Each structure stands twice: as structure tokens, then as C-alpha cells.
Amino acid sequence: MKRDYDLARKYYRLGVLESDAYCYCQLGVMYALGQGVKKDAHAALDYYMQAAEMGDALCYCNVAWLYESGELGKPDLRTAIKWYKKGAIRKEEHAIEALKRLNVPFEK
């Protein structure tokens, strides 16, 4: 199946105009992965942060991953763990698994 990233981006941007956290997150994914746009971790972070501020727990994980992986420059585990913990508090399974993988204690 052919993916139409231009069309997806168009509709996600319309969602952003309505302050839709999911659309912010998906635009972040597009920039993080370079899907139909030039790969740009800093633009991805901006979109993820907007969604995170709206309470999107998955975007807490996406922010954390950008810091953990070094996509933004030098890897920053301290900041990544802070964001994974925010996601784990909201019961986001990806965040909980990441904390386990990093051997960071966390109680639900």
C-alpha cells in the first residue's frame, strides 16, 4: 500500500489547528522518521512537546526516546528518564518498559 505522506501531513496540520494532541504527535513522528518531510529531530521534539503538554502519554515516550537515542545531539539519559517517568505515571506501557530496560525503579 502506497502511503500518501503529503495528504497525511495536510490532515494532521488541520488537526493541529484544532489543538488535537494526536495530530501533534503524528506530525512529530513524521519529522522524527523523515516521512514525507526532511528528517528533523528538533521539529519532532517541538510537535511532541505540544502533544505532551496536552497530556499525550505516548508523546512523553517519544520525547524521552529523542533524548535517549541522541537524535538531538549527545544522548541525555537523565532527561530521557524524567520523560519516561512522566509517561509511566500515566500508565503508558512503552514508558514502563523503557524504565525496566534502563533498570530504573518505578512503582505504578
Set out the residue ranges of the language-model regions.
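Short helix-capping/linker turns of helical repeat alpha-solenoids
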Residues: L17-D20, L33-Q35, D40, E53-D56, ...
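Terminal, low-structured helical/coil segments at or just beyond the last alpha-helical repeat
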Residues: K86-K108
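Hydrophobic face of amphipathic alpha-helices that form TPR/SEL1-like repeat modules
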Residues: M1, Q26-L33, N62-S69, R101-P105
